[in-house]
Amino acid sequence: MTGVQTCALPIFEDHAPAAAPAPSSAALARFGEFMGAATAPGKVNARAKELIAVALSIVRHCEPCLRSHLAAAFALGITREEIDEAAALAVEFAGCPALMFYKETMRVLRA
């Protein structure tokens, strides 16, 4: 360690951050309820929410998320062209790394 303090490095060499406690089953259940409410159709319909979820999965580079939301999108009848448009928005906001992630994920899914 160089002794330079940054957000990613501990202040002292012998100081390690404490491990976060594991979430309780009640907390996980509440999070599951939140996820269900967030993805349920409302003022924004299910198709739009899945396209948003696809774009956010690309921005966050979350491959399991992208796989899940692509499957849900295709089940709703969303076309590859619509998914590509959502991906283009993700790339607009997240740049080249998002484009590379999307292309690689789609290549793997076609294999």
Give the positions of each predicted feature.
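Iron-sulfur (Fe-S) cluster-binding segments and ferredoxin-like electron-carrier domains
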Residues: 28, 68-80, 105-106
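C-terminal structural segments of small proteins and small subunits
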Residues: 84-109
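A generic alpha-helix surface/boundary motif
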Residues: 29-34, 50, 66-68
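Short amphipathic alpha-helical boundary/capping segments
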Residues: 39-45
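Extended beta-strand/beta-hairpin segments
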Residues: 10, 16-28, 86, 102
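Helix-loop "lid/cap" segments that line or gate small-molecule binding pockets
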Residues: 35-39, 72
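Short, small-residue-biased leader/transition segments that mark boundaries at the very start
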Residues: 2-9
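Short, thiol/selenol-centered motifs that function as redox-active sites or metal-ligating centers
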Residues: 52, 56-68
